Each structure stands twice: as C-alpha cells, then as structure tokens.
C-alpha cells in the first residue's frame, strides 16, 4: 500500500555556485530562423545561457508534473531549498501538492546571489528532508486510525541536486546523511514519538551537475546499499542534460514506459494548405506494453538524441470517434502525460483528444504485418492509453479447420489424450507401502511416444481400419508382458509381413493418408516397420519386448530394409525427436562412406537451394574437365617418376617415318579420288 515512491523529496542546492551559467547558449535571433548556440555565437547574434539553478528548477518541476499527472492524489512530491538554512517550499498537504503553489514559491526564492555566507550548504536541506520523511501523510494518518502502536510502512526517496568537488566530498555527504537518518529513527522509536514515523528505508539519489564542457572529479556510481536503511546512487550530469536524466530516472522510480507516436499529420503554421508529420513522446504505466505484447509481437524501440532511455515507437492511425467496439478488446487503461508539454505537437495532440476524438496506434508484427495494439482517448478531462488485445480471446469465434500446426481440428487425438491423462493421474499416499512402485518405476511408466495428430503417425492412423491393431498396440506397452502376449504379437507381425509380400496397400481412408495412397506399398510398409520398431524400443521393459524387437529387425532385413549400425545406435535418440513421416536422413550404406556422404551432401544442397555462386561455377568446371582426356604423362607414368614432355621431339628416325607415312597416305588418297572420278 505504502510504496517507496509514495514520498519523494527534492533538495535543491541554493549556494553561490548555482548562479553561474550552464554554458549552453540559446539564440535570440527568431527572425532569422532557428539556430544553435554555436551558430549564433559565430554570427555574433544575441544569445543567453541559463544558470545552473534555472536548469535544476525546471527539470525538478517537470519531474513532479509528470508524477502528479499520472498519479493524482496518491504520489507526493516535496521541495526543500538549502543555502544558509533549509527553506520548506511545500508540505504533504494536498493543498500544496500542485504546480501553481510550487512555481510561485520558486519565483520568490530566485537565483542565488553571488556574495553569500560561508554557512551555505546543502546539508541543511538533507537534514530537513529526513525530518520530512518522518512526517506522516494523510493516507498514513488514516491507516493509523489514532493508534500510535500500529506499525505503518514508511519509505521514501530523496533526490539531491548539488555540485561536489570530488569523491571525498561526496563520501562525506553520504556519511552525514546516514548518521542523521539513524539519529532520526532513534528519536522516533525510543520513547515512542507522537509527531512522526520511523523511516523503514530511504533511497538517496545525488545528481552532481556541472556546466557544459566542464569535467567533474566525481565518478558515477550505480545503486549501492550503504545499510539496511539507506541505498545511494550518484550521477554526474551536465546542466543542460539534467532533464533527460530525470526523465530516465522517473521511468524506474514509478515503473513507467515511454511511447513515441509517429507520423502525426499537422498543418503548418506558415502554410495552412500543407501538412507535415510530427512525433510526440508520452509517458504512461509500463503495464500498457506488457499486457498488450505477446510472443508473436515485438515492440519497436529507439533512443532519442540526447537521451539514454528507450522509447516504443507506434504509428498514428486514422482518427475516429470512440465507440464501444473499439474498447471491447481493451485489457487496461492508463493515464498519459506528454514529455514536452509546451511543444506545439504535444499541445495539438492533447487538444485533439480532449475534443472527444480517439486515435488508434499500430505496431508491426515479426512477419511484417501491422496490428492495432493501443488507443488514445480522453474521458473526464484526462487522457488515457488503452492496451488492446492483439491475440485471440475467448470471445472470438472458433478457429478455422486449417488453423494450428496439426491441420484440421478433427485430426487431433483428443480421445486418446483423455485416456492418457486418466492413466497418468497421481494420488498422494497416506503412508509408505513397500508394495507400491518406486520412483524409478513411475518414471518408466511415463509415455515416451504420443503423436498429437493422426497425420503424423501410421500405426495410430490405421487403428480404425485394422481390427487387431488396437489390441496389438495395447500389448506392446504392457510392463508385464508374458510369453503368451509375445506369441500373439509375433502372429500379428507375421500377418503384416504376409500382406507386405502380397503387395497389399495399407487401408488408408482419411485425407491424411491420401499422400501415402499414391506411393508404393513397399514405402508404406517400410514407414510402418520403422514406427513399430521405434515404439518397441521405447517400451522394452521385459525380455519378451527384446525378442519382438529382434524379430522385427530380422523381418526388416528380409524385406530389404535392414538398419545399419549407425542407424541402430542413433535410433533411440531419433525416436524422441522425429516422426515416422519425417524426411529421411541421407546416410551412407556402403564401405565408401566418404564418397556417399559427399554425394548426399551435394544432393541435399541442390534440393534445398542453398548452393552459392562459387559452388555452381566449380561444378560446371568439373563437368567440363571430365569430358576432356587427361594428359598421357599422368596416365602412363608410375607414381614417384617424372613424365617427359614431348618424348619423341628431336628423334630424326621417327620424324622421317612420320613424314614418309604422311606422303604415302597422301598418294593413296589421290589415287582413290582418281578412281572414283
């Protein structure tokens, strides 16, 4: 009920150091268009820079605006200004928990003056913050009900914006805060105090801000537990970036999420006939994303320039009026507030929603299609984001017959699954009985093979067509199979062998067996034997099961489908991961295993379409080289010897014989032509 983020106290350092400039210059040349500080300085234009105090005040007030917009009346924020003493800006009273009260008080405080007393320190504000944490809120007073002895949880968070010299100064600041916290608890507990509550836990966040471009000697430190009462974290931030840091911290402090609505069409101020797309960042509860998201959807995230947190990007849809049909799949609604409330796109979006319009937001799926996941609408002067259901709900119609991995709904084995659940029920025993089975026996009884659909199995697909098959399957899974059961199973196996020898096709009747009808009978029985052997291997409890397995393997060898050694070694492993109708493995069956494996790999690559351009060119070159006759020196020379290039070159006798042979052949051909003529 009382969480740590119920109480938040800002301690603002109002010492002389915070009157210096932040060194981020803003141009005043509005007529020349927007310019950065560097461009304005280079052009010699008018420019100014905010002080460290102004940056701290603006960012802290923006922090409390977000809290009060999203959690009105339930989360409280207080401000304490520290210089020579602690100045209380507001209290836990609801009358001071508003923006106008805080801003008017900050105007009266003003920028710190340069000549200051040496007593100015942020420690005064930290002491006052601990005392403020001990003060009960109205909700805590109602929970106590006037009973001082009742323990009420009291936790809080202190955010201190200051500037330290080095790590030693920061360490002394932590020690002083922890000492004062322990002293305050001792005053609240003994004797029992009627003015406050003991502090159960405090989270101290120290923001060490420096001007832009100045290096700090204080190092960042993540959340560290100092004691059971105190956790401390330290962040060193340039003054212009303190607003981004507080926006990042508020996401974790209040479990918020950032959403950027993109592609918002807005008309230009200078040209009313044209429009441009703008983006608006909003903050809301983190549950708006976790409720709507599912396993088939991913939330696209991005990081804005200058920030360190992620924001979810959703696309603007065509706006329309808010109807009950849009809210029917709503899973939850959460308040919304813009990050930059003063920007023109944010104000236009807020006014658009407050006028009674609603906007649907799209998110892309993993497959590339889009789905409407959220909706923005306003009711009672407040803007809400609605998380819509993007998955199938119980109110939707029944799925189509082709939905799901099993194909048709009637293909699932619902009846067999119900019988399996009844057989697998476990009942707690009142006392230990040695006659009951042991834990290992119970684990052995667990089903190891259960096809979900009839289309993924041959044995269970033929149960209605073959009369003796259900009884045969029942005998195979029995733990106490005897000799008589083994004989019956042997008879059924031989009946299968006889029908396979005759070439009878298996009696498939449903559409799932239509593909097997067109195949050969040999292929059907080969798949049937494979599944039957797999089922016997997983249920081989007795020697009778092993006899059946040996008989089936011999039957497969007689049928020309004998398993190899590698197949029998991996059969049990494949039985857990494969179905009888799974694609067959390409395994070598001859002694030249390397060649067959290479051919199988090439064939697999060609069929799967995974060949690269290099493989295609290499195979084409190999096919062309196989057509040409190899060099005779390689064919005739023994291994280890060097083949002589042109062995007959320079031999005059052979050259004369070759020339004479050529002349004789020429004269013979001339005579033959004259005879023909």
Curated annotation (Swiss-Prot):
One of its GO terms (cellular component) is INTAC complex. Residues 578-604 are annotated as: Disordered. Phosphorylated. It is found in: Nucleus; Cytoplasm; Cytoplasm, Perinuclear region. A motif (Nuclear localization signal (NLS)) lies at residues 598-604. Its main location: nucleus. Residues 515-540 form a coiled coil. GO terms for biological process: cell division; centrosome localization; dorsal appendage formation; flagellated sperm motility; meiotic cell cycle; oocyte nucleus localization involved in oocyte dorsal/ventral axis specification; posterior mRNA localization involved in anterior/posterior axis specification; regulation of fertilization. Keywords: Cell cycle, Cell division, Coiled coil, Cytoplasm, Developmental protein, Differentiation, Meiosis, Mitosis, Nucleus, Phosphoprotein, Spermatogenesis. InterPro entries: Cell_cycle_regulator_Mat89Bb. It comes from the Eukaryota. Residues 578-598 have a biased composition (Low complexity). Component of the integrator complex, a multiprotein complex that terminates RNA polymerase II (Pol II) transcription in the promoter-proximal region of genes. The integrator complex provides a quality checkpoint during transcription elongation by driving premature transcription termination of transcripts that are unfavorably configured for transcriptional elongation: the complex terminates transcription by (1) catalyzing dephosphorylation of the C-terminal domain (CTD) of Pol II subunit Polr2A/Rbp1 and Spt5, and (2) degrading the exiting nascent RNA transcript via endonuclease activity. Belongs to the multiprotein complex Integrator, at least composed of IntS1, IntS2, IntS3, IntS4, omd/IntS5, IntS6, defl/IntS7, IntS8, IntS9, IntS10, IntS11, IntS12, asun/IntS13, IntS14 and IntS15. The core complex associates with protein phosphatase 2A subunits mts/PP2A and Pp2A-29B, to form the Integrator-PP2A (INTAC) complex. Belongs to the Integrator subunit 13 family. This is Protein asunder.
């Amino acid at each position: 009920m009382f969480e740590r983020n119920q109480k938040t106290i800002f301690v603002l350092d109002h010492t002389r150091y915070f009157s210096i400039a932040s060194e981020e210059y803003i141009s005043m040349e509005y007529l020349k268009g927007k310019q950065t500080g560097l461009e304005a300085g280079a052009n010699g234009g008018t420019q100014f820079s905010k002080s460290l105090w102004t940056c701290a005040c603006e960012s802290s007030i923006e922090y409390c605006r977000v809290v009060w917009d999203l959690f009105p009346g339930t989360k409280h924020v207080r401000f304490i200004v520290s210089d020579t003493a602690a100045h209380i800006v507001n209290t836990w009273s609801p009358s001071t928990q508003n923006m106008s009260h805080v801003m008017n008080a900050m105007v009266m405080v003003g920028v710190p003056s340069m000549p200051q007393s040496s007593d100015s320190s942020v420690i005064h504000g930290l002491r006052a913050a601990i005392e403020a944490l001990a003060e009960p809120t109205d909700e805590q007073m109602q929970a106590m009900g006037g009973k001082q002895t009742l323990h009420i949880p009291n936790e809080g968070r202190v955010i201190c914006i200051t500037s330290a010299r080095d790590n030693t100064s920061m360490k002394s600041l932590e020690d002083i805060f922890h000492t004062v916290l322990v002293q305050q608890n001792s005053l609240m507990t003994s004797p029992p105090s009627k003015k406050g509550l003991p502090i159960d836990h405090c989270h101290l966040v120290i923001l060490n801000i420096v001007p832009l471009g100045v290096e700090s000697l204080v190092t960042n430190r993540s959340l560290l537990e100092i004691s059971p009462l105190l956790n401390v974290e330290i962040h060193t931030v340039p003054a212009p970036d303190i607003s981004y840091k507080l926006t990042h911290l508020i996401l974790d402090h209040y479990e918020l999420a950032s959403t950027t609505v993109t592609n918002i069409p807005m008309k230009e101020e200078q040209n009313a006939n044209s429009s441009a797309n703008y983006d608006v960042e909003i903050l809301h509860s983190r549950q708006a994303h976790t409720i709507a998201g599912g396993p088939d959807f991913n939330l696209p995230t991005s990081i804005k320039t200058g920030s360190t947190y992620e924001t979810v990007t959703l696309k603007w849809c065509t706006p329309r009026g808010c109807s009950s049909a849009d809210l029917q799949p709503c899973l939850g609604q959460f308040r919304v507030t813009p990050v930059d409330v003063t920007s023109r796109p944010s104000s236009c979006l807020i006014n658009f929603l407050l006028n009674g319009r609603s906007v649907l937001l799209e998110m892309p799926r993993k497959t590339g299609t889009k789905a409407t996941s959220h909706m923005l609408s306003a009711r009672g002067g407040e803007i809400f984001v609605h998380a819509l259901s993007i998955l199938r709900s119980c109110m939707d119609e029944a799925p189509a017959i082709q939905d799901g991995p099993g194909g048709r709904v009637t293909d699932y084995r619902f009846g067999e699954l119900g019988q399996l659940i009844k057989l697998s029920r476990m009942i707690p025993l009142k006392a230990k009985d040695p006659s009951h089975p042991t834990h290992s026996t119970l684990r052995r009884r667990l089903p190891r093979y259960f096809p979900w659909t009839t289309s993924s199995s041959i044995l269970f697909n033929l149960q209605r067509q073959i009369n003796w098959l259900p009884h045969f399957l029942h005998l195979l899974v029995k733990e106490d199979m005897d000799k008589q059961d083994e004989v019956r199973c042997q008879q059924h196996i031989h009946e299968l062998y006889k029908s396979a020898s005759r070439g009878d096709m298996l009696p498939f009747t449903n559409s799932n067996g239509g593909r097997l009808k067109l195949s050969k009978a040999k292929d059907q029985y080969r798949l049937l034997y494979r599944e039957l052997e797999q089922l016997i291997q997983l249920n081989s409890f007795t020697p009778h099961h092993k006899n059946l397995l040996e008989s089936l393997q011999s039957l497969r060898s007689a049928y020309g489908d004998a398993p190899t050694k590698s197949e029998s070694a991996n059969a049990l492993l494949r039985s857990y991961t494969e179905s009888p109708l799974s694609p067959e493995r390409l395994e070598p069956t001859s002694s030249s295993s390397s060649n067959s494996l290479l051919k199988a790999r090439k064939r697999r690559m060609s069929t799967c379409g995974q060949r690269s351009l290099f493989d295609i060119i290499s195979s084409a070159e190999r096919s062309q080289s196989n057509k040409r006759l190899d060099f005779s020196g390689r064919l005739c020379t023994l291994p280890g010897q060097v083949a002589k290039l042109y062995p007959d070159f320079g031999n005059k006798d052979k050259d004369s014989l070759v020339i004479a042979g050529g002349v004789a052949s020429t004269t013979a051909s001339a005579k033959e032509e004259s005879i023909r003529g």
